[in-house]
């Protein structure tokens, strides 16, 4: 039985910008946090400044959207049953050096055999699609916008969890 309702959230860029994980932003650009490399640090600071300027520009016309749902759920072996629909999942595939078990998302949901339903939240986040098309003739700005769009989608999920 499906009693779930999709909920859509829309945020402005400035609402989610404080939640940006800048470490991953810099990793995407090939910067590793090392204080001793002053030249790299200066480059990173310039990139940070330009990223914030771009956020201010994007805030004028674009938003970040999230759709989420809380679903009735149970695990059936390696499968999840969400609102009555079966979703096959995989277990971890790479052996652990310590011999720990191969985990699957279904391991964290109440089993169907318990007869008691559990709840699982699912969501997707994205910036307005047109953002990815900006600056087609400027490789640097295009990459900057795309990297920011990834981080903004992630930031919106952090805000959603408040």
Region roles according to the model:
Residues 141-161:
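C-terminal substrate/ligand-recognition segments
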């Amino acid at each position: 039985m499906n009693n779930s309702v999709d909920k859509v959230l829309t945020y402005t860029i400035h609402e989610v910008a404080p939640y940006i994980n800048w470490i991953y932003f810099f990793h995407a650009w090939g910067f590793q946090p090392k204080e001793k490399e002053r030249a790299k640090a200066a480059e990173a600071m310039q990139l940070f400044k330009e990223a914030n300027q771009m956020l201010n520009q994007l805030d004028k016309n674009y938003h970040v959207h999230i759709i989420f749902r809380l679903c009735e759920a149970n695990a059936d072996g390696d499968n999840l049953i969400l609102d009555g629909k079966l979703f096959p999942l995989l277990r971890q595939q790479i052996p652990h050096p310590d011999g720990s078990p191969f985990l699957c998302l279904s391991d964290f949901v109440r089993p169907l055999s318990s007869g008691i339903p559990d709840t699982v939240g699912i969501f997707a986040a994205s910036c307005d699609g047109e953002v990815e098309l900006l600056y087609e003739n400027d490789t640097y700005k295009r990459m900057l916008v795309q990297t920011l769009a990834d981080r903004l989608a992630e930031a919106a999920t952090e805000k959603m969890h408040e």
